[in-house]
Amino acid sequence: MRELVCPKHMCKTPMGKCMEWDIDEITGQKVQCQEKPVMSTTLYWCSKCNVPMYEERCPECGSKGEYIATDIRPVFPEEKVLLALLLNKEDPLCFEEASVWNNTNYYFIDGERLQVSIKEFNGKSLEEIKAIKAKYSTCVSEIDYTKFDANIQKFIEVNQNRYNEVTDEAINFVQGYKDRYSLENMFVSFSGGKDSTVTSDIVRRAFSSNKVYHIFGDTTLEFPLTYEYKKRFGREHRVLPAKNYEKNFENLCKQIGPPSRVMRWCCTVFKTGAITQTIASAFKNKTNILSFQGIRHNESLSRSKYDRESKSPKITKQTVAAPIIEWTDFDVWLYILTTGIDFNDAYRLGYSRVGCWCCPNNGAWSEFLSKVHMYDQYVHWREILVDFAKKIDKPDPEEYVDQGGWKARQGGNGIDIAERSIISYEPCATEDNAFNYELQRPITPEFYELFKPFGYINPHLGNERLGEVYVLDKKGKVVLVLQGRIGSTKLKVTIKNERLAGATSLKVADGKIQCQLTKYQMCIGCKACESVCKHNAVKIKELEDGSTSYKIDDEKCVRCTECVNHYNAGCYVRKVLTIKREG
C-alpha cells in the first residue's frame, strides 16, 4: 500500500500538501505546515503463498498478510549461496527452496526476519574473503533455479494489480510527451542498472518503437557484468556510448585525490562531460532535448527532492523526465520479473544498486561484494587509496582507508594543485577600477579565450608593446582592458564597466574576473564548462603534451556568462579542491 504523507507529521495529504497546524517559533502564530509530501509504502507477507505483496489481503488466496517492510528486493540463488556461507551453514545450498528477500540489514526467509551485520561481513580480512570466494565458486555451479522461478511466478501472480497500476501510469506519463517532442529529439539515459532498464522498456512500449536513442555514460569504472549486459542490450536498442577518452581515473586520483561522498568529481569528468559531447554530436544544434531517466525518490535523500520533470542542473540543454520517480525497489523488480526483460547479472550476486563499483557512495554491503567478486580490482584500488592517504600525511593510512575516511574527505588540503586556486592581487594605487594580479601560470595566447564571455577580444586597439588587449561589448564600447605580456605572470585588469556581465558593483565585477583567472590556473580539462554551455560554444580537449586546450567559439557564444557563474569561483575543480586560506 502506498500513500502520500507529510514527512513531519506522518499524516495523509489528500490536498497535495500538509494541512496540519504548527506554531511559528518566531511569531508564535499558528501556521499551516504545507510540507511537500513524500510517498510512504507498506508491504505485507502472505504466509500461504510465501511471497511479499503490495495489498494487505492476498488477491490469490484471500489470506490477510502481515506487515513485513517498507521496501524489499528479491534474493537470487547466487546471493543465497553467499549468505549461507557467511552464516556458516553446513550446506551452502540450504536456502535453495526458500523464498528469500532483502531489506538492507534484514533478510526475510519464508517470511521470518533475519538480521545480519553487514559491518561484520565487510570487516573480514582479505584472506577470509578470499577463502569465502573459493567456497562460493565451487558451489555456485550447482545452483538450480527451479524453486526460485516457481516462487517468483507466485510473486508475479499475487502482485498483478500493482504491476498493472504502476505500468499503465508510467506509460501514460511518457505518452504525454508525444506532442511535445519527436523521437529524434529524445533519448533514454542508460546506465546498465535496473532503473534505466525499466525506464527504457516503458519508453519503448509507450512509443511502440525501438528507435529512441540510449546514451550509455561509460565512466570506465562500471562492473564487468555491466559491460556484458550493455553489449546484449545494444543488440536490440540504439545505444550511443559516451566516454571520456582523454582522462584516466587513476591518474586523476593521484592528481586531485579520489572522489568522496561530498565531491564526486568522477561524475562530472567521466559522465556529464562525455554525455554532453555525445548529445552535441547526436542532436547537433538542438537546444532542448528530452531525456528519460530512471531517477527514483527512494534511492537517496538528495533524489527525494527531484521533480518528475525538470531542467537538468548539469547539462543545460536537457529536460529530464522521470517516469518511475515514485517507484520502489519492489515495483522495479515486479516490473522486471513480470515482463521477463533482460537485466544486469550483477543483481544476481546481491548488489542492490549497480553503478561505479568503487563509488564512495556505495554501502558496506556493495563494498563487501566487490571484495568477493572483484578481489584483484579491489586490492589494487585499496593500494591507490593507501598511497593517497600517505601523500596527505594521514597518521595511519590503512586505517583511514579501511574505516572509510577517504569517502568523507572534503577539500584539497595536502594536494599540490589546490594551491593554484589562490589568486594573488592588489588594487592599483593610481586607478580605483584597476587590479594587479600575480598569476601562477604564465600568460599564453589562449589566456584571452577565457574573457570572451565578457565581450569581444580586440588585441589591436591597445598598446601592443605593453601587452594591452581590449574587451569590447557588442556596441564596440570597452568593458575591460587586460595588460600582460605573453610569458609573464603579471597581469593588470582595468574594469571599464562595473556592470560587467550583470555585476552590481566593482567588487562583484572583479569577482567574475577572478573566476576566469582561477579557471586559467586550475583547468585540468574536466569539461564541466562544456556541460553548462547550452550553445556548444565551449570546447575543451587534452593535447598530446598533456596540456589542456580551452576554446570559446565567438560565433556560438551569446555572452550569457553561464560558464563563469555556474560553479563556485568559476571552476569545478576549484569547487572540489577548496582549501583553508590564511587571513
Question: Over which residues does each language-model region extend?
Answer:
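Glycine-centered, phosphate/nucleic-acid-interacting loop/turn motifs that mediate DNA/RNA or nucleotide
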Residues: 527, 536-537, 561, 570-571
